[in-house]
Amino acid sequence: DVDGIVIDLRNNGGGSLQEAKLLTGLFIDRGPTVQIRSKSNRVDILDDRDISIIYDGPLAVLVNRLSASASEIFAGAIQDYERGIIIGSQTFGKGTVQSLLPLNRGQLKLTQAKFYRISGESTQEKGIIPDIKYPSSYDPESIGESTLDGPLPWDKITATNYRRKHSINHLVAELRSLHDERVSDNAEFNYLTEAFAYRKTRNEDDTISLNEEQRLQEKSDRENFWLALENKKRVALGQEPIASLDELDEEEPTIASNDASAASPAIVPTTGESETAEPASNSEIAGSSSAIPVSKTDEAREEPEEEDTTPDPYLVESGHILLDLISLEERTAAGLKQARDT
């Protein structure tokens, strides 16, 4: 038995539509999971018809800007059903499906459908907005469907008939308050918040000086900022401050040691599409990576990577939020029982 489950969908570019439906079905008894509107405006509703539930306890879903496509469908369904709490940052906003049509030379990619949550809201462009937000590792102004040229806009269609599985929306405000209080003096969260705010400010400056002296000064200012921020975190964690960023362990790089020039790396998740013009309901809504053949000899030579045991502040805090949810639900249940008994 477990007290709660955190499903980590960060950097998850998606998968098949069928898998998104099946995964949702593990946590609900039955009901619609997603709507698909074709180019002819026909709307198909995919349902979970299996009344069995694998897990009915407290649930949290952790997402970020690189959570896309099928990940967004699952997170949106969990949020609409109030089956669990969504934590993290705004997702990618990949709410369309494309087909690849073969040509004599190359291929033609055509958008043939859009996905909609059971509430009727599209996941296109806006993505999923978490119930509790974390500082984002990625700049939403440079990564996401909304940053592409001419993306299809967000819109809304008629909601499906569905019954909420739980009632947790009334607890979200208190959960946010508990979260904010907890992370206000959390060294890791303060570090991440300041780091990403600094990167965002730098990313908004689209000018580059051609003056060598000024460029050197900017480089020095940047290094001084990261050194001060790194030492601020280290002191808060009871660690010895460092005199230079060069002292940081290369095997465990931090944001300061990477010191990227933009607010976020230019990474786009694989939110690909079906390779043939199949009906939208049967299409794959996330990318299929090209397989590179590896011989058994090559596999034998590969050494297993050492497991990273560094605590993930986002995952740790998500566990705390889930514990808060469990506590609040128990309090609510106790209050209802007392009201019935009196």
Give each language-model segment a name.
Residues 1-342:
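C-terminal "post-core" interaction segments
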